[in-house]
């Protein structure tokens, strides 16, 4: 409610449920947050990349997002020629679904995650151990099919932007890289005064079949995250069954003004996607080795983060983040020229 009153964002039924429209004032807040995190990423040696909003179904079959994540995705986009051919053959919707599931028909998917695209960027070059870690960052918009009854303001939407990054490193670099990621999440939260947070270590359920990969790799990933979270010196809980299908994760959980928990920043260790995509680098022994992948997003979803910030500050943002920092009010029309000059001077000063 407050966000709409402040003219930060809007929703429109003709655009679609859960698809936020950022208005100019909201855009200022979003840009300031992006500039803030980008400055930190530059200091830590990240490279910014840009990727498409869609990818071939085959990409997500390799990653496992299709079909493991299928219920949370928008339906696939089928190529026009294939649709025309199916129509001429009198195919039914059930036939189309079967053809997509078996891979007989290729299609595209609105990306539910940025990681497969970043993997392909990493894999587009020959890599040596001297190049690692490679840190790729993107403000990437992703799409999830949230049920209409679950949608709410900016905190539960169908289109959202992550301050996403993926680190490709050697096994020996994992611990240090995790610490860097956790430090960044903590800096984001403390800078914005969000001190009421908890930490959750999300692990696999060994009795479930929803996870991919070698159990030994899972054990290594969980051990690395457990060691890292213990170094934070904050209380944390372990949550079996809450891991992503490809790896365990550390979630930073923030309380809103009425005490509800919301997951924001996250750090994940992943031995499985490098295996599924057959990633490699040349080690000091001149042999091929498998990198480890770390997923991290300090804000999590920019939409959710801004939604919680609006409540946290009750609309009274700190000056650097406020959509309107200065208002010049000439006390008489004869001072209008001076007011315009002052406004120009302030704008040029940033």
Please place each PLM-identified region on the residue numbering:
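NTP/phosphate- and nucleic-acid-binding module
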Residues: 1-350
């Amino acid at each position: 409610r407050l966000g709409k009153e402040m003219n930060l964002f809007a929703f429109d039924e003709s655009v679609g449920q859960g698809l936020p429209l950022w208005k100019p004032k909201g855009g200022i807040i979003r840009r300031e947050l992006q500039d803030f995190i980008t400055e930190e990423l530059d200091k830590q040696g990240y490279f910014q990349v840009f990727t498409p909003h869609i990818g071939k179904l085959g990409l997500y079959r390799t990653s496992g997002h299709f079909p493991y994540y299928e219920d949370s995705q928008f339906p696939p986009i089928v190529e026009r020629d294939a649709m025309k051919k199916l129509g001429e053959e009198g195919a039914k919707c059930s036939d189309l679904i079967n053809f997509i599931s078996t891979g007989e028909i290729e299609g595209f998917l609105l990306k539910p995650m940025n990681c497969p695209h970043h993997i392909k960027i990493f894999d587009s070059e020959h890599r040596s151990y001297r190049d690692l870690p490679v840190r790729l960052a993107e403000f990437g918009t992703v799409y999830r099919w949230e049920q209409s009854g679950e949608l709410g303001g900016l905190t539960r939407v169908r289109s959202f932007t992550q301050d996403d990054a993926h680190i490709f490193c050697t096994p020996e670099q994992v611990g240090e890289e995790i610490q860097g990621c956790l430090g960044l999440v903590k800096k984001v939260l403390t800078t914005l005064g969000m001190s009421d947070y908890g930490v959750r270590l999300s692990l696999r359920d060994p009795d479930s079949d929803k996870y991919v990969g070698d159990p030994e790799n899972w054990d290594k990933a969980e051990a690395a995250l457990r060691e890292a979270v213990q170094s934070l010196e904050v209380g944390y809980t372990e949550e079996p069954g809450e891991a992503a299908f490809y790896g365990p994760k550390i979630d930073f959980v923030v309380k809103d003004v009425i005490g509800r928990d919301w997951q924001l920043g996250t750090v994940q260790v992943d031995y499985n996607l490098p295996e599924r995509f057959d990633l490699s680098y040349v080690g000091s022994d001149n042999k091929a080795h498998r990198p480890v992948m770390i997923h991290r997003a300090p804000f999590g979803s920019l939409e959710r983060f801004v939604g919680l910030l609006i409540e946290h500050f009750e609309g009274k943002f700190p000056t650097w983040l406020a959509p309107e920092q200065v208002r010049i009010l000439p006390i008489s029309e004869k001072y209008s020229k001076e007011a315009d000059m002052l406004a120009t001077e302030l704008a040029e000063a940033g």
